[in-house]
Amino acid sequence: LPSHLDERCIRHPGPAAPSAGFVVHWMRAALRLDENPTFDVARTIAEGLGLPLVIYQGIDERYPHASYRHHRFLLEGAADVAHRAEELGIRHVLHVARDGHREPALLRLAEEAAVVVTDLVDLEPWSAWTGAIAKIRPVIEVDAHCVLPRPVFGRTANRPFRFKDATKREMKRRMGQPWPRCTANLEPLSPSWTPPFTPVDAAAALRKDGAVSLLATCRIDPSVVPVAGMTGGASAGMARWASYLNEGLSRYHRTRNNAANRGGVSGMSPWLHHGMVAATRLVRDAAEHGTKGAEKFLDEMLVFREHAYHHAHDVDRPYAWDHVPDWARASWRNTALVHPARPAMDLERAQSNDVLWNAAQRGVVRHGVMHNNVRMTWGKGTVQWMEDPEAAMRLTQDLNDRYALDGRNPNSIAGVMWCFGLFDRPFDPPEVRMGRVRRRDPRDHAARLDLRAYRGWTEAHAGSKRLNVGIVGGGLSGRFAARLLSDLGHEVTVYDKGRRASGRLSDRTASDGTPFQLGAPRVEGWPSWAERHVQDWIERGYLDVDGEHPVVTLPPLLDHLGEGLNVRQLHRVDGLEATPEGARLRIISPNGPLEVNHDHVLVAAPLEQSRALLETAGIHVEGRSEACWVAWGPAPDHAIEPPAGWTLTRRGQDRATLEVRLDPEQSAADLERSLPDMAVVVATTLGLDPNGWAAHRWRFSRPIEGPEHVVHQGAFSVIGDAFGAPIGTAGAALDSAARAVADLHCTVGWQPSEVSARAQQTDLSAWGA
């Protein structure tokens, strides 16, 4: 390899291939083909071996905080890479892990390869994945992110100025160097070759339906929705950079700290994070620019950004609390809360008592970005409402990585940890909460900021327009969808035919006045992404520690989900109609018939009720529910042996109420009995006096057949426990609700941006070769 490539490589020996068919470029963190050292290493090696090159890109479900937002950005990047690869005549194959396609695609591909060349990533799980592939074939990791390669320097420093002093000579030498042109001539791949998996055409998926149908098959977090106005890919990234280079860079030194001016910074961090643009290109352009703004931009790129990457390369477990300096950790042990503690979910939903902090959090939730100057203040905020500083740091990292398009990155790791003392010095005298760690009072920050203008963009609705959404059904799926939409800045109205929040999660009151669960006795099947929500409900006392059983009953959980929402009880929707603008609902309300228009309607009623309602709009859904009889009455003092298919549970504080549940088979046999008759049958079958007994028939207790995915047709979407998986569970209800909301934010279409991502390249003379 020429020196400018060789210095960027870390080699992992592995078994040689008995008969190699090609070289694999495993594209995972540098999603571009122009000015990409990994690509250049791969094609140089392929030429030397006389082999074709295959570019493999995988979008996995197992990366931290995998979500619709991050997946969508990655799919756009993949579409851009595929477009450029076709121009270059090189085969690019994309594997998206999803239902029916979770095979070890890369391992199988590596078995056919001579060597696997990939981007250097110092974080887990990517490091572990590198090791797994190295057991199959030799792997070469290439630094495609830094101006000064990590294999050349790769050391941390306790302060940024020390890193700057240690690297300034090399940075000065490198920052203006054009990237050498790679002139490798590659052997063509056989037209008959097929990859050991079914490749995905990302551009086709985006053009078809905004990748909605593809994302529906991925086990990822749908509650983190795609963002508007930020398209992944090298061409989109370079178009953004070209605009900023021409119009904003010269003023960067004056505008970069004004968070109210969203255009005052380049906003390039999401594309830099994914390696969709080359840091070497941006640095070279800024060096040629020669303005004071460019000088400050170079300082950010070559000191703070590079320092973070070299730090993550040098230390184990870059996220770990023990990397915070000893003086800071000792200081934190002697601090105390000033404000009342708040639940983590309140903070995630921007419900603190600080206006600036809330505005910043809403901005990253809705738009996937946060102004860096505010991020330094925001990052020091969570510890104001959490007793344990280490837990506060973990939550801050979690929020940043979950929502920010530039999260899960050495820069964001270092940025969050700086808020807790990393790369900083002590400040005395100690403060009550922050101790000796640098303070950034949000009130002071807000005072020097045009807060109204800042909130104007951070608190704007997610997506391309503010939606007016109607939701039919106020159960778990309906209320969860409503809360997500409301948190994203949309207008939402929930219509429920009952007097209060209940539905199939309803309760009753035992003879001693204690409420007990009449509807679904447990909530289960939670998707992994919902763990933080379930934990929140446990901590608030709605669910038992197992996350499945109510502490008392489940309607209080529904009431909690409906807090602050426009929920209209006793509003029965009896008709749907598509309109040119969206959808119209026909409603029977306490004040008489109504007709209400919405941009979109989510139908969240039980399956059979949804079917009948949807047919009024010409929409047909298939499915079937099972029935369940529940009866209750005074409990005897003695034990009772229940008949087959009957479950007996004593309820109430004095256990004086006996609840009887019949399984679906037993319930179906008596389905058409009247309620009073069934109460008598149950009591007498148990040998008890029927006085004081009552019964309830759940004709549609739980779906057992259904689509198991959200159904969309025009302005209508159908959600609930029949429209998710596992069918018939609370998890399915929650998952379908979140996916329907995410789908509303998936814009349809994709085209490469007109500004080319191709770098101005040169020969090796500038590198002394």
Can you say where each PLM-predicted feature lies in the sequence?
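N-terminal Rossmann-like FAD-binding beta1-loop-alpha1 element of flavoenzymes
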Residues: 466-495
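Trp/Phe/Arg-rich N-terminal binding region typifying the photolyase-homology
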Residues: 1-186, 293, 362, 381, ...
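Flavin-binding catalytic cores
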Residues: 663-701
